[in-house]
């Protein structure tokens, strides 16, 4: 009896704001964290935490940890600041997805999970959004 091993897939949660980028890879249920990294772990200056370069470095680190745990592919969930803030993700989001694919992880579906208010609180004064 030869049993085929099932491909293990995870979810890559990418929170990309204009100040920082955070990448977390969990199992399919989202209950167990397999790997995580943020901008401050790969660059020295605070201003570089949200840069595409930092996002690529984080994605390489996270992908290596995930591949060591047997994850073969990920579904990507990109999130911007949301709420009354910007609904577009920061500059690190696109670089993260590219770097995850380059690092050897198979990319399934990519979805935007930025929270949108259904007429929530009043926006801050002088907000250009």
UniProtKB/Swiss-Prot annotation:
The UniProt entry, under InterPro entries, shows: Ribosomal_uS11, Ribosomal_uS11_archaeal, Ribosomal_uS11_CS, Ribosomal_uS11_sf
Tell me the subunit arrangement. Part of the 30S ribosomal subunit.
Q: Per UniProt, what is one GO molecular function of this protein?
A: structural constituent of ribosome
Name used for this protein in its record: Small ribosomal subunit protein uS11
Keyword check for Repressor:
no
* Described purpose of this protein according to its UniProt entry: Located on the platform of the 30S subunit.
GO BP: translation
Biological source species: Haloarcula marismortui (strain ATCC 43049 / DSM 3752 / JCM 8966 / VKM B-1809)
Keywords annotated in UniProt: Ribonucleoprotein, Ribosomal protein, RNA-binding, rRNA-binding
Keyword RNA-binding recorded: yes
Instruction: Give the CC-aspect GO terms.
Output: ribonucleoprotein complex; ribosome
Q: Which NCBIfam families match?
A: arch_S11P, PRK09607.1
Name of encoding gene: rps11
Q: Which Pfam families match?
A: Ribosomal_S11
Q: Which family does it belong to?
A: Belongs to the universal ribosomal protein uS11 family.
For this chain, the annotated S-S bridges are none
């Amino acid at each position: 009896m030869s049993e085929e091993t099932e491909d293990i897939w995870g979810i890559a949660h990418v929170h990309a704001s204009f100040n920082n980028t955070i990448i977390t890879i969990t199992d399919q249920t989202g209950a167990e964290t397999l790997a995580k990294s943020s901008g401050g772990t790969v660059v020295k200056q605070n201003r570089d935490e949200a840069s595409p370069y930092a996002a690529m470095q984080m994605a390489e680190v996270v992908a290596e940890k995930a591949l060591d745990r047997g994850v073969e592919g990920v579904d990507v969930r990109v999130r911007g600041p949301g709420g009354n803030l910007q609904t577009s993700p920061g500059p690190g989001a696109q670089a993260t997805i590219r770097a995850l694919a380059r690092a050897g992880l198979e990319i399934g579906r990519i979805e935007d999970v930025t929270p949108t208010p259904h007429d929530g609180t009043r926006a801050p004064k002088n907000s250009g959004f």
